[in-house]
Amino acid sequence: MLSVFGLRTVARCNSTLASGGARAAAAAGGKAGAQYSALPKSVHALYFQPLKLPVKHHDLVADLQLRAFDNQSLDFFANFALRVGYYLGIPMTGPKPLPTRRERWTVIRAPFAHAKSKENFERHTHKRLLRLWDANPEVVEMFLSYITKHSMAGVGMKCNMFQRESVQLAQELADVPLAPGAPQTADEVVGAKVAELMQSPEFKKHL
Protein backbone atom coordinates (compact mmCIF):
# COMPACT_ATOMS: atom_id res chain seq x y z
CA MET A 1 0.00 0.00 0.00
CA LEU A 2 2.84 2.42 0.80
CA SER A 3 4.50 1.82 -2.58
CA VAL A 4 1.21 2.28 -4.43
CA PHE A 5 0.42 5.75 -3.00
CA GLY A 6 4.02 6.93 -2.93
CA LEU A 7 4.13 7.58 0.81
CA ARG A 8 7.59 6.06 1.07
CA THR A 9 8.95 8.56 -1.46
CA VAL A 10 7.30 11.46 0.35
CA ALA A 11 8.80 10.33 3.61
CA ARG A 12 12.20 10.12 1.99
CA CYS A 13 11.94 13.65 0.58
CA ASN A 14 10.86 15.05 3.93
CA SER A 15 13.73 13.40 5.74
CA THR A 16 16.21 14.67 3.15
CA LEU A 17 14.88 18.24 3.42
CA ALA A 18 14.95 18.10 7.21
CA SER A 19 18.55 16.93 7.29
CA GLY A 20 19.57 19.63 4.79
CA GLY A 21 17.83 22.31 6.84
CA ALA A 22 19.48 21.05 9.98
CA ARG A 23 22.89 21.14 8.31
CA ALA A 24 22.26 24.68 7.04
CA ALA A 25 21.14 25.82 10.48
CA ALA A 26 24.18 24.20 12.07
CA ALA A 27 26.47 25.88 9.54
CA ALA A 28 24.83 29.26 10.14
CA GLY A 29 25.02 28.76 13.89
CA GLY A 30 28.67 27.78 13.67
CA LYS A 31 29.47 30.86 11.60
CA ALA A 32 27.61 33.14 14.02
CA GLY A 33 29.30 31.43 16.96
CA ALA A 34 32.71 31.95 15.36
CA GLN A 35 31.99 35.63 14.85
CA TYR A 36 30.64 35.89 18.40
CA SER A 37 33.70 34.21 19.91
CA ALA A 38 36.02 36.52 17.94
CA LEU A 39 34.85 39.50 20.00
CA PRO A 40 37.03 40.71 22.91
CA LYS A 41 35.96 39.59 26.36
CA SER A 42 35.11 43.15 27.39
CA VAL A 43 32.71 43.46 24.44
CA HIS A 44 31.42 39.92 24.94
CA ALA A 45 30.49 40.81 28.55
CA LEU A 46 28.14 43.58 27.37
CA TYR A 47 25.63 40.94 26.27
CA PHE A 48 25.26 39.70 29.86
CA GLN A 49 24.36 41.18 33.22
CA PRO A 50 27.20 43.05 34.98
CA LEU A 51 29.36 40.93 37.23
CA LYS A 52 29.59 41.69 40.95
CA LEU A 53 32.28 40.93 43.47
CA PRO A 54 31.15 39.30 46.74
CA VAL A 55 31.01 41.44 49.88
CA LYS A 56 33.41 39.98 52.47
CA HIS A 57 33.84 42.42 55.36
CA HIS A 58 30.53 44.35 55.04
CA ASP A 59 32.35 47.67 55.42
CA LEU A 60 30.06 50.25 53.78
CA VAL A 61 32.21 52.99 52.23
CA ALA A 62 29.77 54.92 50.01
CA ASP A 63 26.16 55.25 48.90
CA LEU A 64 25.58 56.35 45.31
CA GLN A 65 22.10 57.61 44.45
CA LEU A 66 21.13 58.07 40.81
CA ARG A 67 18.17 60.20 39.74
CA ALA A 68 16.53 60.72 36.37
CA PHE A 69 13.18 61.45 34.77
CA ASP A 70 13.54 58.47 32.41
CA ASN A 71 13.78 54.86 33.58
CA GLN A 72 15.71 53.71 30.51
CA SER A 73 18.58 56.19 30.94
CA LEU A 74 18.66 55.55 34.68
CA ASP A 75 18.95 51.77 34.35
CA PHE A 76 21.54 52.08 31.59
CA PHE A 77 23.81 54.31 33.68
CA ALA A 78 23.35 52.10 36.76
CA ASN A 79 24.46 49.15 34.64
CA PHE A 80 27.51 51.14 33.52
CA ALA A 81 28.40 52.07 37.12
CA LEU A 82 28.23 48.42 38.19
CA ARG A 83 30.65 47.43 35.42
CA VAL A 84 33.07 50.20 36.41
CA GLY A 85 32.98 49.06 40.03
CA TYR A 86 33.66 45.46 39.05
CA TYR A 87 36.74 46.32 36.98
CA LEU A 88 38.06 48.54 39.81
CA GLY A 89 37.64 45.69 42.30
CA ILE A 90 34.87 47.30 44.36
CA PRO A 91 32.14 45.00 45.74
CA MET A 92 28.80 46.64 44.96
CA THR A 93 25.15 45.88 45.62
CA GLY A 94 22.13 47.21 43.79
CA PRO A 95 20.65 48.91 41.95
CA LYS A 96 17.88 49.19 44.51
CA PRO A 97 14.76 51.07 43.33
CA LEU A 98 13.84 53.94 45.65
CA PRO A 99 10.40 55.56 45.94
CA THR A 100 9.51 57.69 42.94
CA ARG A 101 9.04 61.37 43.65
CA ARG A 102 5.92 62.85 42.04
CA GLU A 103 5.48 66.59 41.60
CA ARG A 104 2.37 68.29 40.24
CA TRP A 105 1.72 71.87 39.18
CA THR A 106 -1.57 73.55 38.26
CA VAL A 107 -1.41 76.71 36.15
CA ILE A 108 -3.83 78.76 34.09
CA ARG A 109 -3.93 78.08 30.35
CA ALA A 110 -3.49 81.74 29.39
CA PRO A 111 -3.36 85.08 31.21
CA PHE A 112 -6.44 86.57 29.55
CA ALA A 113 -8.72 84.54 27.26
CA HIS A 114 -8.39 81.19 29.05
CA ALA A 115 -7.62 82.49 32.54
CA LYS A 116 -10.49 80.54 34.11
CA SER A 117 -9.35 77.17 32.74
CA LYS A 118 -6.54 75.26 34.43
CA GLU A 119 -3.88 72.87 33.15
CA ASN A 120 -2.03 70.25 35.21
CA PHE A 121 1.60 69.18 34.79
CA GLU A 122 3.25 66.21 36.48
CA ARG A 123 6.89 65.16 36.79
CA HIS A 124 8.23 61.81 38.06
CA THR A 125 11.77 61.52 39.44
CA HIS A 126 13.01 57.92 39.50
CA LYS A 127 15.84 56.88 41.81
CA ARG A 128 18.27 53.98 42.13
CA LEU A 129 20.65 53.21 45.01
CA LEU A 130 24.08 51.60 44.63
CA ARG A 131 26.19 50.68 47.64
CA LEU A 132 29.98 50.33 47.64
CA TRP A 133 31.70 48.02 50.12
CA ASP A 134 35.20 47.06 51.28
CA ALA A 135 37.20 49.69 49.36
CA ASN A 136 39.64 52.40 50.36
CA PRO A 137 38.88 56.11 49.77
CA GLU A 138 41.37 56.41 46.88
CA VAL A 139 39.62 53.72 44.85
CA VAL A 140 36.20 55.21 45.61
CA GLU A 141 37.38 58.64 44.43
CA MET A 142 38.74 57.07 41.25
CA PHE A 143 35.37 55.35 40.69
CA LEU A 144 33.46 58.61 41.21
CA SER A 145 35.77 60.62 38.96
CA TYR A 146 35.43 58.05 36.16
CA ILE A 147 31.64 57.86 36.19
CA THR A 148 31.48 61.66 36.49
CA LYS A 149 33.71 62.06 33.44
CA HIS A 150 31.53 59.66 31.42
CA SER A 151 28.20 60.74 32.90
CA MET A 152 24.98 60.84 30.88
CA ALA A 153 22.82 63.85 30.23
CA GLY A 154 19.67 63.72 32.31
CA VAL A 155 21.08 61.47 35.07
CA GLY A 156 22.01 63.09 38.37
CA MET A 157 24.32 61.61 41.00
CA LYS A 158 24.57 62.05 44.76
CA CYS A 159 27.24 60.23 46.78
CA ASN A 160 27.65 59.88 50.54
CA MET A 161 31.09 58.62 51.59
CA PHE A 162 31.81 57.03 54.97
CA GLN A 163 35.24 56.93 56.60
CA ARG A 164 36.03 55.42 59.99
CA GLU A 165 38.50 57.16 62.29
CA SER A 166 39.57 56.65 65.88
CA VAL A 167 37.76 58.34 68.77
CA GLN A 168 40.87 60.39 69.60
CA LEU A 169 41.11 61.88 66.09
CA ALA A 170 40.79 65.50 67.29
CA GLN A 171 43.53 65.00 69.88
CA GLU A 172 45.79 63.32 67.32
CA LEU A 173 45.36 66.23 64.90
CA ALA A 174 46.11 68.73 67.67
CA ASP A 175 49.35 66.92 68.51
CA VAL A 176 50.67 67.08 64.94
CA PRO A 177 53.63 69.51 64.94
CA LEU A 178 53.46 72.37 62.48
CA ALA A 179 56.30 73.27 60.16
CA PRO A 180 58.63 75.84 61.78
CA GLY A 181 58.14 79.34 60.47
CA ALA A 182 55.20 78.38 58.26
CA PRO A 183 52.77 81.30 57.71
CA GLN A 184 49.31 80.78 59.12
CA THR A 185 47.25 83.61 57.60
CA ALA A 186 46.87 85.19 54.17
CA ASP A 187 48.67 88.37 55.28
CA GLU A 188 51.64 86.37 56.50
CA VAL A 189 51.78 84.50 53.19
CA VAL A 190 51.83 87.79 51.25
CA GLY A 191 54.44 89.27 53.59
CA ALA A 192 56.70 86.24 53.22
CA LYS A 193 56.45 86.45 49.42
CA VAL A 194 57.26 90.20 49.43
CA ALA A 195 60.28 89.62 51.65
CA GLU A 196 61.48 86.87 49.32
CA LEU A 197 61.17 89.16 46.28
CA MET A 198 63.02 92.01 47.98
CA GLN A 199 65.96 89.74 48.78
CA SER A 200 66.24 88.47 45.20
CA PRO A 201 69.19 89.76 43.08
CA GLU A 202 66.93 90.83 40.20
CA PHE A 203 64.98 93.13 42.50
CA LYS A 204 68.11 94.65 44.08
CA LYS A 205 69.38 95.73 40.65
CA HIS A 206 66.56 98.26 40.36
CA LEU A 207 67.11 99.81 43.79
UniProtKB/Swiss-Prot annotation:
For this entry, the transit peptide stretch runs: 1-24
The entry lists its GO molecular-function terms as: structural constituent of ribosome
**Do you know which Gene3D superfamilies this protein is assigned to?**
Ribosomal protein S10 domain
Per the record, GO CC terms? mitochondrial small ribosomal subunit; mitochondrion; small ribosomal subunit
* GO BP terms, alphabetized: translation
Q: Which residues form the signal peptide?
A: none
Keyword Protein transport listed: no
UniProt entry keywords in alphabetical sequence: Mitochondrion, Ribonucleoprotein, Ribosomal protein, Transit peptide
InterPro entries for the chain:
Ribosomal_uS10, Ribosomal_uS10_dom, Ribosomal_uS10_dom_sf
- SUPFAM superfamilies for this protein: Ribosomal protein S10
Q: Give the UniProt subcellular location, in the record's own words.
A: Mitochondrion
Q: Which family does it belong to?
A: Belongs to the universal ribosomal protein uS10 family.
The role this protein plays is: Involved in mitochondrial genome encoded proteins translation. Involved in the binding of tRNA to the ribosomes.
Show the NCBIfam families listed in the entry: rpsJ_bact
Q: How does it assemble?
A: Part of the mitochondrial small ribosomal subunit.
Q: What is this protein called?
A: Small ribosomal subunit protein uS10m
